[in-house]
């Protein structure tokens, strides 16, 4: 799947939003990718997951024991990656602000884990999720996401593969351009309060 084909899937599902958004990373942006919309169609979600699975080197695909994704954003694409790879897919939750496995999910000691996210911007959530997998006894061997918004700068400490790289400018508090600052802020991400 080419970058343009991926973006076409986002446009077709009205998943590319414009406005003033506070991202989960705490940074501001004039654009937001609502991956839940692009993944709401099971056929589209399956196509995207198959294309994402093909980004992984063959030897790495053979190494994976289980797919883990952080709730909420990673749930659907994580499940579809499990299907694409023929592996179980489980997820992490933040009941107290820190990621944990719940609902009877567990990892076998030393399990080789593929971490799956919808979007990576700074990599903070990914690093927290990877740390949670370590606490649970697993080893993250790679991470994948539908979208890399980090401009290739996210250091996750593991090999990282994205289906597409999209570089919308983001701004720290106090650095938001005047035109963007005039638009009311929406907090659509997983850390929205």
From Swiss-Prot:
The record's section on CDD domains has: PRTases_typeI
What keywords are annotated for this sequence in UniProt? Glycosyltransferase, Magnesium, Pyrimidine biosynthesis, Transferase
Q: Which cofactor does it need?
A: Mg(2+)
Q: Which residue windows are coiled coil?
A: none
Q: Output the superkingdom of the source species.
A: Bacteria
Looking at its record, which EC class is this enzyme? transferase
Q: Which residues form the signal peptide?
A: none
Q: In which pathway does it act?
A: Pyrimidine metabolism; UMP biosynthesis via de novo pathway; UMP from orotate: step 1/2
Against InterPro entries, the record matches this protein to: OPRT, Orotate_PRibTrfase_bac, PRibTrfase_dom, PRTase-like
What's the catalysed reaction? orotidine 5'-phosphate + diphosphate = orotate + 5-phospho-alpha-D-ribose 1-diphosphate
Residues annotated as binding 5-phospho-alpha-D-ribose 1-diphosphate: 117-125
Disulphide bridges, residue numbers: none
* Pfam families membership: Pribosyltran (PF00156)
MF terms from GO for this chain are: magnesium ion binding; orotate phosphoribosyltransferase activity
> Could you confirm whether the keyword Transferase appears in this record?
yes
Under the heading Gene3D superfamilies, the entry gives: 3.40.50.2020
| Any Gene Ontology biological process | pyrimidine nucleobase biosynthetic process
Tell me which PANTHER family the record gives: OROTATE PHOSPHORIBOSYLTRANSFERASE (PTHR19278), URIDINE 5'-MONOPHOSPHATE SYNTHASE (PTHR19278:SF9)
Family (UniProt)? Belongs to the purine/pyrimidine phosphoribosyltransferase family. PyrE subfamily.
Q: Which NCBIfam families match?
A: pyrE_Therm (TIGR01367)
- HAMAP family from the UniProt entry: PyrE
Assembly and partners are described as: Homodimer.
The name this protein carries in UniProt is: Orotate phosphoribosyltransferase
Gene name of the record:
pyrE
């Amino acid at each position: 799947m080419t970058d343009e084909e991926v973006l076409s899937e986002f446009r077709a599902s009205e998943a590319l939003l414009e406005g003033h958004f506070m991202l989960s990373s705490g940074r501001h942006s004039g654009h937001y990718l609502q991956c839940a919309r692009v993944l709401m169609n099971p056929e589209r979600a399956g196509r995207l997951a198959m294309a994402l699975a093909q980004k992984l080197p063959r030897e790495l695909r053979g190494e994976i024991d289980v797919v883990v994704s952080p709730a909420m954003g990673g749930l659907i694409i994580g499940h579809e990656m499990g299907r694409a790879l023929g592996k179980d897919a489980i997820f992490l939750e933040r009941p107290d602000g820190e990621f944990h496995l719940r609902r009877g999910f567990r990892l076998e000691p030393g399990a080789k884990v593929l971490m799956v996210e919808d979007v990576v911007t700074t990599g903070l959530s990914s690093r927290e999720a990877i740390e949670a997998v370590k606490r649970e006894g697993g080893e993250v061997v790679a991470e994948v996401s539908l979208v890399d918004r980090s401009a290739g700068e996210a250091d996750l400490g593991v090999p990282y593969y994205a289906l597409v790289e999209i570089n919308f400018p983001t701004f720290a508090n106090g650095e938001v351009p005047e035109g963007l600052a005039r638009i009311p802020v929406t907090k659509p991400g997983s850390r929205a309060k």
